[in-house]
Design a protein with these regions (language model features):
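Active-site-proximal loop/turn and secondary-structure-junction residues that shape catalytic pockets
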Residues: 34-36, 59-61, 93-96, 146-150, ...
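Histidine-acidic metal/acid-base catalytic patches
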Residues: 5, 9-12, 20-29, 36-51, ...
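Conserved beta-strand positions in the central sheet of alpha/beta enzyme cores
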Residues: 54-56, 89-91, 143, 179, ...
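A short acidic, helix-capping loop that chelates divalent metal ions and anchors anionic groups
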Residues: 61-65, 98-100, 150-154, 217-218, ...
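Glycine-rich, proline-tolerant flexible connector loops at the mouths of alpha/beta enzymes
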Residues: 57-81, 147-152
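Active-site acidic/histidine proton-transfer and metal-coordination neighborhood
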Residues: 5-14, 19-20, 44, 97-208, ...
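Alpha-helix-loop-beta-strand connector modules within alpha/beta enzyme cores
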Residues: 73-89, 161-174, 200-201, 264-265
C-alpha cells in the first residue's frame, strides 16, 4: 500500500551499526540539523547514540540543503557512508513562499528560514535542485509545502493545486514523490485541510508529510481526529514533535516528545496497524534542554518510549 524504497522486502528494519539494536516497522530517523549544523557530529549521534539507520536532510554547515555545492554534497555523502546512514527524504523548502497576486501573508518571513529565502519565480530551480539532491543521496522523496498561509486562500486554491499537480508530475517522471507537509504557516495546516488537498490533487507522486505537532499547533487534535480523516495510502512521511498548550491561552509551544498533548503512542500504533512502514522522523523544535543537541536527546528518549508503548520498537 505504501511506496517503499531500497528496503521494501524487509518487514522490519534492524538498526545496529553503531549503537543499540533497534527493530521497528518504521524507518526511524531524525532531521540532521535538529541536532547540530555540524553534519559529521549529527550523523555520529544519530547512528552511534540513537542507533538509527536513517536520517532526514534539511541543512548543514549553516546552509540550506538546496544551497549545497558539489564539494559539500560529496562530503555529506562520505559522512553518510561512514555512519551507514540512509536518507529518508530531502527536506526541501519547495513552495514555502508567497503566492503571486495574493495579499501578502502575515506568515511571510522577513528573514530566511532554515537558510532558505526563495521567491515564487525561483521555485522551478528549487524543484530541480531538490530532485538532483534526492538522486545524489539515493532517496525517492522531496518535502514541499503549499505557500504561506492566506486569510482567504479560496480564490487561489485551484491555481495552487494545479501548481502542486504539475510539480508532482515533473517529479514523478524522474522517480520522485513529493511529500507535502501540513504546516501552520502554510495553507494546509491540519489533517482536515490535508484531506481536502489530497482529494483535490490526485497524483501518486504527491503524498502527505503528516506532522501531528503542526496540526496541534493549529488547534486540531491530530490523533485520532485529524488522522482519522487522512487517506492512509497517501501518507508518505511523518514528522515527530510534541506541543503543549500554554496556560490561560489558546496557543501552543513546542515540547519534548511525550511531554505535550499529542497521543504519540496511539498515533504510532495506528500507523503500524494501517500498514505504514516509511519514515517517522524526529523534528525536535523544542529547545528546553538548553541546546539543540541536548533537547533532541531528551525528545528522542520520549519518542522511543512512545514507540515502545505502541509496540513499534523492540
Amino acid at each position: 500500500m505504501f511506496r517503499a524504497g531500497a528496503f521494501a522486502s524487509m518487514a522490519m528494519y534492524g538498526m545496529q551499526a553503531w549503537g543499540e539494536i533497534l527493530k521497528s516497522p518504521f524507518r526511524i530517523a531524525v532531521i540532521n540539523d535538529e541536532i547540530t549544523q555540524d553534519f559529521g557530529r549529527a550523523c555520529e549521534i544519530a547512528a552511534r547514540d540513537f542507533g538509527m539507520q536513517w536520517i532526514e536532510l534539511r541543512g548543514m554547515w549553516n546552509k540550506n540543503i538546496v544551497n549545497l555545492d558539489d564539494k559539500e554534497i560529496a562530503e555529506a555523502g562520505r559522512i553518510l557512508k561512514k555512519y551507514q546512514l540512509h536518507v529518508t527524504d530531502i527536506a526541501s523548502p519547495l513552495f514555502k513562499c508567497d503566492w503571486p497576486g495574493a495579499p501578502k501573508s502575515k506568515f511571510s518571513p522577513t528573514s530566511p528560514q532554515f537558510g532558505a529565502d526563495f521567491t515564487f519565480d525561483q521555485q522551478g530551480d528549487v524543484l530541480e535542485r531538490s530532485i538532483r539532491l534526492a538522486k545524489a543521496f539515493d532517496t525517492d522523496r522531496v518535502r514541499c509545502f503549499d505557500f504561506w498561509r492566506l486569510d482567504d486562500a479560496a480564490p487561489f486554491r485551484a491555481a495552487m493545486n494545479a501548481k502542486l499537480l504539475d510539480a508532482a508530475k515533473q517529479a514523478g517522471k524522474r522517480g520522485i514523490t513529493l511529500v507535502l507537509e501540513n504546516e501552520g504557516a502554510c495553507n494546509t495546516a491540519t489533517g482536515a485541510e490535508a484531506a481536502k488537498l489530497l482529494a483535490a490533487v490526485q497524483s501518486a507522486n504527491l503524498m502527505l508529510n503528516w506532522d501531528p505537532g503542526n496540526a496541534a499547533g493549529a488547534g486540531e487534535k491530530p490523533y485520532p481526529d485529524g488522522y482519522r480523516l487522512l487517506p492512509k495510502d497517501r501518507i508518505g512521511h511523518c514528522h515527530c514533535k510534541d506541543a503543549a498548550k500554554l496556560p490561560n491561552a489558546n496557543k501552543y509551544e513546542w515540547a519534548a516528545m511525550g511531554k505535550g498533548v499529542i497521543d504519540w503512542a496511539g498515533q504510532f500504533r495506528a500507523l503500524k496497524n494501517d500498514g505504514y512502514h516509511l519514515a517517522v522522523s524526529l523534528e525536535t523544535h523544542w529547545r528546553g534542554a538548553g541546546t539543540a543537541e541536548a533537547s533532541t536527546r531528551q525528545s528522542w528518549a520520549g519518542m522511543k518510549d512512545a514507540l515502545r508503548k505502541a509496540g513499534a520498537l523492540e
